[in-house]
Amino acid sequence: MKSHVRSFKTYIRDEIIKKGGWVNAHAHADRAFTMTPEKIGIYHSSNLQQKWDLVDEVKRTSSVDDYYARFCQSIELMISQGVTAFGTFVDIDPICEDRAIIAAHKAREVYKHDIILKFANQTLKGVIEPTARKWFDIGAEMVDMIGGLPYRDELDYGRGLEAMDILLDKAKSLGIMCHVHVDQFNNPSEKETEQLCDKTIEHGMEGRVVGIHGISIGSHSKEYRYKLYEKMRKAKMMMIACPMAWIDSNRKEDLMPFHNALTPADEMIPEVSLLP
């Protein structure tokens, strides 16, 4: 009798478990499981920037207990899938204040023997507006990594670079890493990854900064991409490929290299990797 042939999925799962299990490096667990049939139409017709504010309703009406329930459900789902380390952004801003992060810490205490949990503060309201800045400063003391969204302050005030300064100053003062959403919109006019590299070196944060998404990198010319990889190497910058933001990209007539939603890791790894 022939031995049972495992599926490719099973093979990959087993091999990853042998090496210590999956790592989910980027999530927003505080807002998980909040989509409803009534909201689908609104979200379907809205772009990513609009969704940054559409979630205000959920944030405003969620209690610590509501957030705690969603964190627990998210964590248990990760554990069931073989995830051993889970990094999630947590909203801390004028809308939800500190309710989500209080719930996050409560959940981490419950699951501390089952999974490694790390938190970064999500700054959907930016860090320039005074009340948003207040909650950024409060939240920074309650997380493991500083999180940021410079494009919010670029969109609202034209001050995206200043937002990067604030994020990196805070991370450096606290001695922790900084995870920053960059280049999400599949647009060759976006150069946030390069800007973040420059700011990382300026602030002496080499090796402690992570870019998230990087979708627009692939929309640039090959010459630009390889110059960027050299900057990333100098900044010792890491990237988290998170292609889901692509789903919000509208049809456009810009001419650009043909590419998919993934950060161009096939090019990036040999050019940026610090491993021998």
Swiss-Prot record:
Residues 1-29 form the signal peptide. Transmembrane segments: none annotated. Keywords: Signal. InterPro entries: Metal_Hydrolase, Metallo-hydrolase_Enzymes. Disulfide bonds: none annotated. SUPFAM superfamilies: Metallo-dependent hydrolases (SSF51556). PANTHER family: CYTOSINE DEAMINASE. NCBIfam families: PRK06886.1. Belongs to the metallo-dependent hydrolases superfamily. This is Uncharacterized protein HI_0842.
